[in-house]
């Protein structure tokens, strides 16, 4: 069983509907976020928790913000995906699941609108709702290293049901996937949510939150320039942490001339010398001087590995 690392509670999320005590899951090292839509306009009961995701985002239409409810730890498997016996793992495949309250079905949208039920139709969601999702994804990237990338194809519902848009991953593709996808992309499942949500805009907002830029659109004039490795998440750079990412960071600090605090060179264990070297690098960059605490975040990582 994996060991949980990093913060397990999304800041500001309510635990009024906490199900982990009754439906304990497996511990995981999360590297995937799956987005769902609830197909309802209020917080679901999830059968008392038996089919709950890790979190639910409920739009507060008057305040123009998302209210978050957390049901399981970030790195505890939740229960919102079909997981067939003997097939690929879904709920337990290093995935954090988020249900977005509202609908992706145009027929349901029209029905609710005619009945006067205020709701979010996620394929045409307002900016504040997309920004709320983006802030969560930015936090997941910063704290858990979930890549701000995902499938190119997000077909509209009902085409997305089953595999009508050809969007659903094979078992092998799912096992290799890292990043953000929809319920519509997960194998062994047939649901088509969240439909044609504006995924490109969500990623744009998430990257703006972190000031990391849009790597997919950046073209360099020097093809031989090494690609910046994906930021693994802050959880790997805490006191006593031992992992390959610490060594990779340390080697790059030495390469860039910021290894003065090492006595014998970088290692796999995060220590005070690493923090001081990172702080020296941060102080050398005007973009980072206001936050030179020695803890690497996405922007520090990108700038360090960009040359």
What is each stretch, according to the model?
Residues 2-148:
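Active-site-adjacent loop/helix surface patches within enzyme catalytic domains
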Residues 2-11, 103-227, 280, 296-307:
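Basic/polar, cationic surfaces and motifs that engage anionic cell-wall
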Residues 84-85, 115-127, 233-241, 263-268, ...:
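Second-shell loop/turn segments in exported
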Residues 94, 99-104, 182, 186, ...:
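Glycine-rich, acidic and aromatic/proline-enriched surface loops and short helix-turn segments
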Residues 131-138, 244-251, 255, 272-283, ...:
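Solvent-exposed, polar/charged alpha-helical surfaces in well-ordered, non-transmembrane soluble domains
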Residues 212-268, 273:
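Acidic, Ser/Thr/Pro/Gly-enriched interdomain connector segments
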Residues 228, 234, 288-290, 305-307:
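Post-signal peptide N-terminal regions of Sec-secreted extracellular proteins
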Residues 280-292:
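Extended, structured, electrostatic nucleic-acid-contact surfaces
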């Amino acid at each position: 069983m994996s060991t949980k690392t990093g913060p397990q509670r999304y800041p500001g999320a309510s635990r009024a509907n906490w199900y982990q005590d009754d439906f304990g899951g497996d511990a995981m090292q999360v590297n995937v976020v799956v987005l769902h839509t609830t197909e309802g306009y209020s917080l679901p009961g999830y059968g008392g928790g038996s089919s709950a995701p890790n979190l639910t985002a409920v739009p507060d239409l008057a305040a123009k913000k998302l209210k978050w409810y957390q049901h399981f730890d970030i790195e505890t498997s939740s229960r919102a995906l079909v997981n067939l016996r003997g097939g690929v793992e879904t709920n337990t495949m290093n995935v954090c699941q988020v249900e977005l309250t509202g609908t992706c079905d145009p027929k349901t949208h029209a029905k609710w609108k005619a009945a006067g039920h205020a709701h979010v139709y996620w394929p045409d969601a307002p900016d504040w709702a997309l920004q709320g999702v983006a802030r969560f994804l930015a936090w997941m990237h910063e704290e858990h290293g979930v890549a701000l990338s995902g499938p190119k194809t997000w077909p509209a519902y009902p085409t997305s049901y089953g595999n009508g848009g050809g969007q659903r991953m094979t078992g092998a593709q799912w096992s290799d996937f890292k990043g953000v996808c929809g319920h519509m992309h997960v194998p062994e499942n047939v649901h088509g949510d969240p439909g044609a949500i504006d995924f490109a805009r969500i990623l744009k907002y998430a990257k703006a939150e972190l000031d990391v830029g849009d790597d997919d659109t950046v073209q360099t004039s020097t093809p031989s320039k090494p690609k910046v490795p994906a930021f693994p998440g802050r959880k790997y750079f805490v006191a006593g942490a031992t992992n390959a990412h610490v060594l990779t960071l340390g080697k790059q600090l030495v390469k860039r001339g910021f290894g003065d605090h090492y006595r014998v060179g970088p290692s796999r264990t995060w220590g005070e010398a690493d923090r001081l070297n990172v702080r020296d690098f941060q102080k050398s960059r005007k973009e980072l001087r206001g936050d030179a605490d020695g803890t690497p975040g996405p922007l520090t990582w990108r700038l360090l590995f960009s040359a």
